[in-house]
Amino acid sequence: MKPLVLLSALVLLSFQVQADPIQNTDEETKTEEQSGEEDQAVSVSFGDREGASLQEESLRDLVCYCRTRGCKRRERMNGTCRKGHLMYTLCCR
């Protein structure tokens, strides 16, 4: 049952990341122009108070990053994420 819940949460997360447009502010535009930044942290939350049963320990420990290159060791590719017009690989561990 846990793998099914985890898989469902990851699918919903990837849909949410692709569906939510990110508005560019001046600060975000400056960040995009800096080519030195490779990795960006992503905040992941599953459900709300009604869906609190989904927040099992395995889901709360999930950490995801948007990476310009491939995933690092012990990370799995879980889709893509977008910031403005740039596409990144969504890597979770």
Curated annotation (Swiss-Prot):
Keywords: Antibiotic, Antimicrobial, Defensin, Disulfide bond, Secreted, Signal. Residues 23-49 are annotated as: Disordered. It comes from the Eukaryota. This is Alpha-defensin 2. One of its GO terms (cellular component) is extracellular space. It is found in: Secreted. InterPro entries: Alpha-defensin, Alpha-defensin_C, Alpha-defensin_N, Beta/alpha-defensin_C. SMART domains: Defensin_propep (SM01418), DEFSN (SM00048). Belongs to the alpha-defensin family. Disulfide bonds join 64-92, 66-81, 71-91. Has broad-spectrum antimicrobial properties. Has antibacterial activity against the Gram-positive bacterium L.monocytogenes EGD and the Gram-negative bacteria E.coli ML-35p and avirulent S.typhimurium 7953, but not against the mouse-virulent S.typhimurium 14028S. Probably contributes to the antimicrobial barrier function of the small bowel mucosa. Residues 1-19 form the signal peptide. One of its GO terms (biological process) is defense response to Gram-negative bacterium. Its main location: secreted. Residues 20-58 form a propeptide. The lineage of its organism: Eukaryota, Metazoa, Chordata, Craniata, Vertebrata. Paneth cells of the small bowel.
